[in-house]
């Protein structure tokens, strides 16, 4: 979808989704597994439970971003993230279209 044209060169500009990462952290084994969640401090969905995560910075590797976001939001130092899912529903975030990459950390 073309969103605009460059005023200088006339080329089309395209809107692209932003990339976010979510950390899935578990502990325990068998039937007593626990999952680490945070309570969102800001809109959208303020006060709701969520996986720790956030936006990937420009030039940042998503695997580095998920480790950074996990540390920033929980104080937990993760390592060796493993990609487990991708979620691209345009309605997931009311602010903008995001592609969410889920990592087991």
Regions found by a protein language model. Name each.
Residues 76-85:
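A short coil-to-beta-strand element that immediately follows conserved catalytic motifs
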């Amino acid at each position: 979808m073309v969103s605009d044209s460059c005023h200088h060169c006339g080329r089309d500009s395209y809107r692209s989704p932003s990339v976010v990462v979510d950390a899935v952290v578990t502990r325990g084994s068998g039937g007593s597994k626990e999952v680490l969640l945070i309570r969102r401090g800001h809109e959208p969905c303020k006060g709701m439970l969520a996986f720790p995560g956030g936006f990937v910075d420009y030039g940042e590797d998503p695997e580095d971003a998920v480790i950074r976001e996990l540390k920033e939001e929980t104080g937990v130092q993760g390592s060796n993230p493993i990609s487990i899912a991708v979620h691209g529903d345009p309605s997931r975030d009311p602010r903008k279209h995001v592609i969410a990459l889920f990592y087991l950390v």
